[in-house]
Amino acid sequence: MRGNSDPVFLFSYFKGHGDGLHLAWSGDGLTFEALANDQPLLTGVAGPEKLMRDPFLSPANDGLFHLVWTAGWHGRAIGYASSPDLIHWSCQELLPVMGHEEDARNCWAPEIFYDEDMARYIIYWASSIPGRFPQTDHSGDEGLNHRMYYVTTVDFKTFSETRLFYDGGFNVIDATLVKDGNRYLLFMKDETLDPVCKNIRVAVSDTLFEGFTAPGPPITGDYWAEGPSAVKVNGRWIVYFDKYKLNQIGAVISSDLVHWEDISDRVHFPAGAQHGSAVKISFERIKHLL
């Protein structure tokens, strides 16, 4: 019998070309079962493209679930909505996080990190601005050359100015930030096409916005991977990711962030799940969806 306070893992994802927010849950971090009969709990209506891709769900201390997502292939805004129960949702909004950058081509895969030291939320995403980092202007698909940017907020109503979050000297998307004791881990996709990388790497820092080490070697294998999401399970890090050319979710596991074992054959997700994000949460907050 699972108790209300028992920790479980909640996985948010999309299917198809961006049909909306899907959820799955797991007690062991390996086998995820779809909630709501694998139907979207929310579909995108914000923005001209009305997409909802790469949904990231943050179960905040204010009692709400805060959701951000990629609202379109193009544009300078991200999608945002909140919910107390994952059933009833606020009106969807477009947050114009790159509105000040007229040449910005996109805003992809936003995520939320809660900064406990400053009691604020950090929203970060990948954008490509032509000519901003000329040394890698021709390294990506269709001339895209991404770096990571961020804003901060305490209430999801007012936001700081947009700042550069991470520039590792290469084309990067799909970063995910987690805290490990007193240090920060930044898992990311090396989006370089020439020469082909398309893999997941990790950088480490003792401070939140600067000081990240050069990312280590790829932690994923001989396939294209994106959309990493990292959780700690029984003292070891599991990183889930989208093997998007193979149409499956993969995973690797490590106890030291150096040596990684591929456990893709041991994880199970709903068919068709794409670019998901996992968070640890109490069973009480999702049991009504079972």
Residue ranges and their predicted role:
Residues 1-290:
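Carbohydrate-active catalytic/glycan-binding domains of CAZyme proteins
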